[in-house]
Amino acid sequence: IDNRIVGYDAKTGQKKWTVQRTAPALTLRLAPGMVIHDKDVLIAQPGGKLMSLILATGAPRWEIEVGVARGATELERVTDMGGTPVVIDDDVCAVSYQGRVGCFDLATGSPRWTREISSEAGVAVDQRFVFVPDDKGAVFAYNRDSGTSAWKNDKLAYRRLSTPVSYGRAVAV
């Protein structure tokens, strides 16, 4: 992984831009999740970073740390983004391994709310909740507007859970 993002013209296949960031010494080597929304591309980067680029030019709009490296050794400081960021209304919601889950302002990257959690699976989001499994197999639901805890289910403890999917009144992992 060279930590490079490349934008191509959809009609011609010609390269339009390249953005490269320095990779941390250790990562989980998760594939970076990307989502295009309107005129931006949102990218989950190694090292627990979430970045918004202007799709036409590759120019950075903002970059934030969702996962903050902590610990005495390189191994303890490993943090990475889990899954693909999810855009809903004016929010982008994301989670990191050894970091946080949260929803951030789509235009500025400013946090609306964050909670400490560790997940490599990713999030599902609906109009009311953000759903995320932690790395111990518990599934959490947070209020999308405030980040307050709605519920927790730990019946799937110590299983490697997938990115949640929500539909109507159900959520599956």
Residue ranges with predicted function:
Residues 1, 164-173:
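Short, intrinsically disordered, charge-balanced linker/junction segments flanking boundaries
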Residues 6, 51, 102, 140-141:
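WD40 beta-propeller blade core
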Residues 1, 45-46, 89, 96-97, ...:
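Structural signature of WD-repeat beta-propellers
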Residues 15-38, 63-89, 112-127, 149-168:
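Extracytoplasmic beta-rich repeat domains
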Residues 1-20:
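A generic tandem-repeat structural signature
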